[in-house]
């Protein structure tokens, strides 16, 4: 009955009527409550029903698995988990389908369902799945092999832990090797072999994770498998792809894909285990370079000069991305000293230019289809060609990467040669303009990638360009490249300035095509920002006037370029631009208003606006121009526009004098208050409001606190805003500057009682806060106040009740303080926080013994667990008194400060035969966000000039422990022996001195 209902609903799901589909989907979800729903779906999939119906059953089975099979799935929903009998039936049926099906679509769906279940059930509940899948890999059926690779890809990428991996890996590597080593009967099977190489690469990536914890296992595994794999890779590279006429052989796409996957694997091996690649790298580079040479003619013929519309493949459907990978491998391999010697003769003082350089320039030529795109879409041209940060995911970019590697790692005169070739070939009518453009592009890109400044051999190129421009015979993209070249090297030679008027003429020429005009605009932007000889200041108004005419016609990348150019022109002389305020400021406001949702454009305009204000000779005059417009924007309903207005107001304050003009605060504070009321759910606007308040405090605290607005003081306005921020149910980031603002207020509040209410709001917020940075900022406020007046603050905290049950502010504060101590950073902050903790410990209150906080972790495992597993098995802690916890934290900090710095020697995997590659934050396990967080100055703008900020914390703690143990403060001498051994020893040593 249930099965027939499921079949009917699956049929309706495929109905053309959307209402029928929705009702059927709801019906299927309702049936998920039946314990055997998954079994029924697999039965339908294995039946003789139509393929669409069976496919639909497998799709719903996949959905059911992630929602109901196991709590380990992130998308798991409450509901009945199928019992073991149902699970066993589903697993067995799916494995049978994996072996018996011959329909590609169904096999893909089955393989995905198998991989999902295997992710959570292997090996404990489903040990037979991997042997079965490995057996499939040894079959001759392409669908079966595809299915096997699908499952293995998922297992290796998602679920294998180290114990399982080192059991499976040797067998997997052996079977994969045999599969890839064999000579397949057709090209489609070779495509599957390429997939197998990708799987092998995933195994290498997984091994790298374990090379610290399982170093010996990793060493043995690599030493056993790599030699035969490397030998096999060499043989695969030796296969010929083209015939004697340089025509790509039919049915060779699979071979090419294999070569591309091998290149990617070798690049990954260089990244993970460079010493393992060293013995083979020269052989591989010779083989790969031979392939690159042989593919040049087909690439030029079928991509660069072809009318074909497919820009992702060439030849016999060769994926271009694999040609990119072959080039990138050579680029990486050039870090090897042995590879460098392949191309450079050490016996010749100045080595001759090898033929590889002109070859690589040919690979940088623009394909015909790309030229057509660029000539019709200026934004696409700007996005891809105006930045010299070449995209290495294209053949053009990958070839530049190899040229740059030659420049960086060899003594070959790459830049000199490229420039000499350019000067010669630009005037040679027999050289195709596409090659001329490629040479100039290579000159700029290789220079941009180089860390060294090289300004020679440019003048002859400029002379050649001048001749071509005078003849007016350059095609559109070549003329554009002329201007880009001139602009790029304007910081290297004064000769570039001779072209300024020519470029301006093209910019104002209404008949000139967009591509050339925006290339001219980019050149002007470079002249203004980095030019060795910048345009004379008298030209600034004219440049800005010309650029302003493009405001209405620019969009997308062209608009970004326009804003960058305007910004650069303004910064020629910000003070002079300020004098043009009646024209420049409205232009900036118009651009920001029409592009309010573009953060990059808004950011540039905000910076430019701030620079103008900062340089203005008359700040009050600038306020008269800008404030009315800003307040008009702030009163709009659109939060995006309000955001822009608030940001610009913050810029205006930041660039202003100290103190601010009279009446300034009274003019801007009401709109800021209004923002916090009307847009109370907009985190970003609330943050901007706090930035404005903080800016006003930094610039003119007296005016802010004394200003009377509708019967309330500025001080009361701020307190009310802070109360609103702390009391509302929002993300902690909405209050991110409350702490720094409070510190400023604390320094100016006439009596402590003025802040008691807001401090209690802070403590209530701490009880539910989650973000460590916000928590630290508030704890820091209390730490500063305790250090300033420990007795008064402790009486306030211990006597203030937060609820009818008698919960004190002290209890909540110390619970959060102790639980989050591990997150506190920045030496000055930790110093103040630790000093405050010593004063709390010294306070005579029974709460130090009665208040309980988290102690040590009780239940934990050394095994890495997922977030889902941690939800199922939450960590448990012991509990200790807050007094003992303070002592424990302070002793840990003291021991940490006392230790000598240990510099760990990082292993380079014996890679001495390789030049160092670029080091990124990711090398140290840091994301870009981590780096940004670490680079922030904690609570910048807050006055940290007190003596406590400069305290030698190690010495301070030493004296504290010495005096505390002498007087046995809070039974410290007894508590010491409950501390970890290292802390115990340190404190006992202090006592004995």
Curated annotation (Swiss-Prot):
| This protein's UniProt keywords | Nucleus, Protein transport, Transport
> In Gene Ontology terms, what is one molecular function of this protein?
GTP binding
SMART domains for this protein = IBN_N
Q: Which GO terms describe its biological process?
A: protein import into nucleus
- Where does the Importin N-terminal domain start and stop, copy by copy? 24-100
Protein transport found in the keyword field: yes
Q: Which domain of life is it from?
A: Eukaryota
Gene3D superfamilies per the UniProt record, alphabetical:
Leucine-rich Repeat Variant
Q: Where in the cell is it found?
A: Nucleus
Q: Which intervals of the chain form a coiled coil?
A: none
Main localization category: nucleus
Listed GO cellular component terms?
cytosol; nuclear envelope; nucleus
UniProt cross-references to PANTHER family, sorted A to Z:
IMPORTIN-7, 8, 11, IMPORTIN-9
The entry's function note states: Required for nuclear protein import and mediates docking of import substrate to distinct nucleoporins. Serves a receptor for nuclear localization signals. Mediates the nuclear import of TATA-binding protein (TBP) and of histones H2A and H2B.
Name listed for the protein in its UniProt record: Importin subunit beta-5
Protein's organism: Schizosaccharomyces pombe (strain 972 / ATCC 24843)
- Taxonomy-wise, where does this protein's organism fall, top ranks first? Eukaryota, Fungi, Dikarya, Ascomycota, Taphrinomycotina
